């Protein structure tokens, strides 16, 4: 840890310690299958220009009218430039402000009440209005070591992304953390 502090004082920032965007996951929980689910699917596909994945109910909940195996949601994972572009648009909906409570160690999440709040999206009466959850994951370079198939290894505690690192990364995007 002392080596990291000394390096920062010297002004030599190690490129492996840089916090980078890993992925952005967008989820629309429709709660029912059928026509409304198909509309949400086409909406998300149109928004991100990528094919979404359908999520299915894990168990039957009679009070909600949901059966096990029924399609009840849609999600899509964005990476790279596409993820950063969508994230910036989604943060403008929240007026570039996030609560400290929605930020964790290497991740943060927020919700968008209406998709028509996103820039460049107009209301279509045929589709309706859908809300969505946006979950963002951050990492440092070298995290593949923990996920790869061969010669897996643990990530050192000093190399993990902390809550303070996440807040600093958000502030570099111009987001105000309250």
UniProtKB/Swiss-Prot annotation:
GO BP terms in the entry: translation
UniProt feature coiled coil, ranges: none
Keywords: Ribonucleoprotein, Ribosomal protein, RNA-binding, rRNA-binding, tRNA-binding
GO CC annotations on file: ribonucleoprotein complex; ribosome
Gene Ontology molecular-function annotations: rRNA binding; structural constituent of ribosome; tRNA binding
Claim: tRNA-binding is one of the keywords in the record: yes
The protein's assembly and partners: Part of the 50S ribosomal subunit; contacts the 5S rRNA and probably tRNA. Forms a bridge to the 30S subunit in the 70S ribosome.
Recorded family membership: Belongs to the universal ribosomal protein uL5 family.
Function of the molecule: This is one of the proteins that bind and probably mediate the attachment of the 5S RNA into the large ribosomal subunit, where it forms part of the central protuberance. In the 70S ribosome it contacts protein S13 of the 30S subunit (bridge B1b), connecting the 2 subunits; this bridge is implicated in subunit movement. May contact the P site tRNA; the 5S rRNA and some of its associated proteins might help stabilize positioning of ribosome-bound tRNAs.
Protein name in the entry: Large ribosomal subunit protein uL5
Gene for this chain: rpl5
């Amino acid at each position: 840890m002392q080596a990291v502090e000394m390096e920062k004082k010297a002004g030599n920032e190690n490129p492996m310690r840089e916090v980078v965007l890993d992925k952005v996951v967008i989820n629309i929980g429709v709660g029912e299958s059928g026509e409304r689910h198909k509309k949400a699917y086409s909406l998300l596909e149109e928004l991100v220009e990528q094919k979404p994945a359908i999520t299915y109910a894990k168990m039957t909940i009679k009070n909600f009218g949901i059966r096990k195996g029924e399609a009840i949601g849609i999600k899509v994972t964005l990476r790279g430039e596409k993820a950063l572009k969508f994230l910036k648009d989604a943060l403008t909906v929240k007026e570039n402000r996030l609560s400290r409570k929605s930020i964790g160690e290497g991740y943060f999440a927020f919700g968008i009440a209406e998709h028509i709040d996103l820039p460049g999206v107009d209301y279509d009466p045929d589709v309706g209005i859908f809300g969505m959850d946006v979950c963002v994951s951050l990492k440092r370079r070298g995290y593949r070591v923990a996920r790869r198939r061969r010669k897996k290894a643990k990530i050192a505690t000093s190399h993990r992304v902390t809550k303070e690192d996440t807040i600093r990364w958000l502030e570099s995007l111009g987001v105000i953390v309250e």
